[in-house]
Amino acid sequence: GHLFVAEQADHIELSGLVFDGSNRTMGGYTQGLLDLRRIAHLAIDNCQITGSGKNGLALEHAIGRIERSEISGAADAGIYSVEAGGLSITGNTVSDCANGGILVHRWQVAEDGTMVTGNRVQRIQARSGGTGQNGNGINAFRAGNVVISGNIVSDCAFSAIRANSASNLQISGNTCSRSGETAVYSEFSFEGAIISNNIVDGAANGISIVNFNEGGRMGVCSGNIVRNLSTSGPYPADSPGFGVGIGVEADTTVSNNVIENAPLYGMQIGWGPYLRNVVATGNIIRNAGTGIVVSVVEGAGTAVISDNIIDGALNGAVVGQRWAEPATGDLASSNDTGYAHLTVERNHVS
């Protein structure tokens, strides 16, 4: 069966209510404990939604706001929104859900404009498995113009914040602790991602702005602190492995970040031929396996690596690689890299 279903409503407002699903099985026709579809004006405030057998709160074509509510113990995601038309998800606590925290999805790539701000998301599992579909604190999928800011996200099986094919995306001012895989991920066919002023402490990889092979490009990665990364993740790693501070590929600037304790690479620039127009300047990298690795495969595009401080990189400060294999000596030791696409200068190595 179901607890609360509404469709084609002009105005629904829920305030100060407790919805407890008691972990009961739900009917196949319903998406969540509260299942609200095509709501022209939705306001949910100061509610508790707990123990859902599916999603806690499931929204389809919703416009409005969800705020100051507590959502916990969902068998799927805490909040699942699809095809929203201007939604604000603000000041909520989402915890102890089996597959996801706050999901902002669309059926096709389009503008979405959901704002996910000031929420606490914690202890999100990936009970249904996979390599990233589940286990994320905040997830934007095919949704453009989404803002994810000022959230505190901890103890997620995969990513604290994960965006797939989400263009014109802002991820800023979030605190991401103890992520099982990549803490902040912008992947697949996105165009335009600003990832700035976030704190990442504890993850397999820190921040990834990747998948130029799928058309993923155009990013700014600045002012982040990324530290205490691990070489182990929730599944056997693809090459080159886990333990990378920041990874970028195309049309992206990486500036003024501080990376500490990245056991594989402090920074990874490009993967095989998937490298174009990357500038990495003014970063500090401490205690890394290799400070910065950059692709030197035939077909790799322009990269400028300058004015960085690299302190305590065990396997070299700046090293050219062919995919996962080192192909050069330490490029930081002279200004001539021997590669036309690559400028490495004025880096301070200690």
Which residues make up each language-model segment?
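Leucine-rich solenoid repeat scaffolds
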Residues: G312-Q321, A327-S350
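Extracellular beta-strand solenoid repeats
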Residues: V5, E13, D35, A43, ...
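Short glycine/acidic-rich loop motifs that flank beta-strands on beta-rich extracellular proteins
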Residues: G1-L3, N23-T30, G53-E60, A75-E83, ...
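Small-residue (G/S/T/A) turn/hinge positions that recur once per unit in extracellular repeat modules
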Residues: A9, I39-A40, A62, G85, ...
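Short, contiguous acidic/charged loop-to-helix segments that flank catalytic cores in large enzymes
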Residues: Y185-E187, I209-N213, G241-V248, Q268-G272, ...
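Extracellular beta-strand-rich solenoid/capping regions of secreted or surface-exposed proteins
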Residues: G1-S15, D20-H41, G56-H61, W107, ...
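Low-complexity, intrinsically disordered tandem-repeat tracts enriched in small residues
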Residues: S149, S196, A203, G219-S222, ...
